[in-house]
Amino acid sequence: MIARSKPNVDYNFLWECICGKGQQIDNTISNSFFFNSGASSLLFFLNLFGTKKRVGLQVFTCSTVLDVIQMAEDRVVLMDIDKDYFTTTYDIVEKHIDSIDILILSHLFGIPNPDYLRIKQLCQLRGVVLIDDLCQTFHAKIGGYFLEDLSDNYFYSFFYDKPISATSGGMLKLSDDLYT
């Protein structure tokens, strides 16, 4: 693992914040938490579901995401991509949907997944938790709506090579049902 992206999560502090026992932070995005890296935010998210989960991941993604899945002691189910959008498709996800518990859907180079709404609906119907990897995409639109507004769970990285650059850091946004 790249040393700069090794997750460092204060689980007790975060759990106290989630349960409302910690300090209150005024966020404009509800249910959002900030971390030292995008990898830390993803690790925290995966750990909410325990270990040994089957995590769907497209083959063209940052190697740090794969490292985090392994750190969480989960199993990776790799999925192919569409070469025009650099992301997986509805048809590919549908083939794997019964063999995954969580789907990490990466949106790369500012291009949202063109099948996003269908994939999200499929995940909801099959009980698969969907989290959007928005580390390379900020305020991309689908049907006139920002991807962030359509997504229930997503994470950012604020490393120097990302759309929102702050040298380091990350953010996780949780859905209401995971937050409460």
Which role fits each region the language model picked out?
Residues L134-A166:
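Conserved active-site segment immediately N-terminal to the catalytic lysine
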Residues I29-S30, K52, E73, I100, ...:
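Short, well-ordered alpha-helix to beta-strand connector turns
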Residues K95-H96, L122, L147-L150, L172-K173:
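Short, hinge-like loop/turn segments at secondary-structure boundaries
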Residues M1-T51:
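Conserved PLP-binding active-site segment in aminotransferase class I/II-type PLP enzymes
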Residues P163-T180:
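Conserved core segment of the aminotransferase class I/II
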Residues N47-L125, V129-L134, F138:
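PLP-dependent aminotransferase-like
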Residues F35, I81-D84, Y160:
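Short, acidic/glycine-rich phosphate-metal binding loop used to engage nucleotide
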